[in-house]
Amino acid sequence: MEIIPAIDLLNGKCVRLNQGNYNEVTKFNSDPVKQAQIWESKGAKRLHLVDLDGAKTGEPINDLTIKEIKKSITIPIQLGGGIRSIDRAKELFDIGIDRIILGTIAIEKPELVKDLSKEYPKRVAVGIDAKEGMVATRGWLKQSKISSLDLAKQLNDLDLAAIISTDIATDGTLKGPNVQALREIAEISINPVIASGGIGSIADLISLADFADEGIEGIIVGRALYDGSIDLKEAILTLKNLLLQDAFNEKDKFLV
């Protein structure tokens, strides 16, 4: 299980939204390239990058910034936001993005997700962003008629890198993740699950570490890193030690 710091791009700046609301924007760093370097220096093994402009409009407004971030760090990047065509996906892979995250097209163009996952096995993730159990699309501005669990089941036939499960109601609130929703997704998904939304403390990370053996392989953290609620270096070490201790206890149990 890994902790993945998030950078959300809006007009070339590093920001966070509250519950996906574009009218509630907090700017944390006007230099997202520098921010990416900071997260790598603190031990991040992967970066979660979201093009909020792309998610809302479908247009690649932040491509220059994305390319600069890619050049400035050595860790792999997973990128989501406005990826709604094969050509766009190929553009991002060509500039060195490790994983793409598909959201809206998983609902609107499921065949496209299938085709991309075949052409790029284990390099396509699907973001299941849910509000009251129903999947939201178009930068969370529209509500679909499919539940998050039904979508997760439909994706079981695809060779995905991961499902990124976000509870919109908790995202950006620091009030803790929706553990029940995450467990339900992990239970029915063959693909690995990455948790996102609501992480506000080390205790929240520890609560999710208990489910590492149930298919939750990563935790995306955003606002809590920026406001100092969580120190990335400390969090990575804490989680590593906790998982090592769990593995030791499991091994010891069989030796008794």
Curated annotation (Swiss-Prot):
* GO annotation, cellular component aspect: cytoplasm
**Gene Ontology biological process terms, A to Z:** L-histidine biosynthetic process; L-tryptophan biosynthetic process
This one is known as 1-(5-phosphoribosyl)-5-[(5-phosphoribosylamino)methylideneamino] imidazole-4-carboxamide isomerase
Taxonomically, which superkingdom? Bacteria
Q: In which pathway does it act?
A: Amino-acid biosynthesis; L-histidine biosynthesis; L-histidine from 5-phospho-alpha-D-ribose 1-diphosphate: step 4/9
Family (UniProt): Belongs to the HisA/HisF family.
Reactions catalysed according to its record: 1-(5-phospho-beta-D-ribosyl)-5-[(5-phospho-beta-D-ribosylamino)methylideneamino]imidazole-4-carboxamide = 5-[(5-phospho-1-deoxy-D-ribulos-1-ylimino)methylamino]-1-(5-phospho-beta-D-ribosyl)imidazole-4-carboxamide
Compartment(s): Cytoplasm
* Enzyme's top EC category: isomerase
* Gene3D superfamilies cross-referenced by the UniProt entry: Aldolase class I
Ordered alphabetically, the record's keywords are: Amino-acid biosynthesis, Cytoplasm, Histidine biosynthesis, Isomerase
Q: Does the keyword Cell cycle apply?
A: no
What InterPro entries does the record tag this protein with?
A: Aldolase_TIM, His_biosynth, HisA_bact_arch, Isoase_HisA-like, Isoase_HisA-like_bact, RibuloseP-bd_barrel
Alphabetized GO MF terms: 1-(5-phosphoribosyl)-5-[(5-phosphoribosylamino)methylideneamino]imidazole-4-carboxamide isomerase activity
Known EC number: 5.3.1.16
Q: Where does this chain mainly localize? A: cytoplasm
Give the active-site positions.
8 (proton acceptor), 129 (proton donor)
Q: What gene is it encoded by?
A: hisA
